[in-house]
């Protein structure tokens, strides 16, 4: 018997799901980069991570996820929407992008909003990860902020790229 379902959107690696799967949860990582025929990693604790290809920039697919999981035991959600058009590290390119599409940042911020709407409709706690960005202005301020080094660990030379 599963402890519940954990959803992760815009998630290619599934790394954030690993502790959940190891603890016996059924986890789903959705990302457009996954192969059409997904794969499943299983863990000793009875959990798994299933990798599913999905274009999350298509609102119809967000609605599809809501329909798939609305009657399931979803216990947590996480999302890592693309930050390319929002992160302040790319501010030097904002003017050029706005010239091509004045709505480019509104469109980009919608992806985070859609994730929040999905998790809200499913009634589950969640987080949406994004670096320092225009999201704070276009949508809402974060409830929590952190630096990646706070959650990382030392990488031995043999494992470094």
Provide a role label for each language-model segment.
Residues 1-161:
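Conserved active-site and SAM-binding loop architecture
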């Amino acid at each position: 018997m599963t402890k519940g379902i954990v959803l992760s959107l815009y998630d290619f690696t599934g790394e954030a799901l690993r502790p959940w799967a190891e603890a016996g949860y059924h986890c789903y990582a959705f990302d457009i980069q996954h192969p059409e025929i997904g794969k499943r990693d299983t863990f000793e604790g009875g959990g798994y991570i299933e990798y599913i290809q999905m274009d999350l920039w298509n609102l119809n697919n967000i609605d599809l996820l809501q329909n798939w999981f609305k009657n399931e035991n979803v216990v947590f959600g996480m999302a890592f929407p693309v930050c390319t058009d929002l992160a302040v590290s790319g501010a030097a390119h904002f003017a050029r992008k706005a010239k091509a599409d004045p709505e480019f940042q509104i469109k980009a911020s919608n992806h985070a909003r859609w994730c929040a709407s999905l998790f809200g409709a499913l009634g589950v706690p969640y987080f949406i990860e994004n670096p320092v960005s225009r999201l704070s202005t276009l949508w809402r301020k974060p409830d929590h902020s952190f630096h990646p080094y706070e959650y990382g660990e030392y990488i031995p030379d043999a494992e470094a790229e």
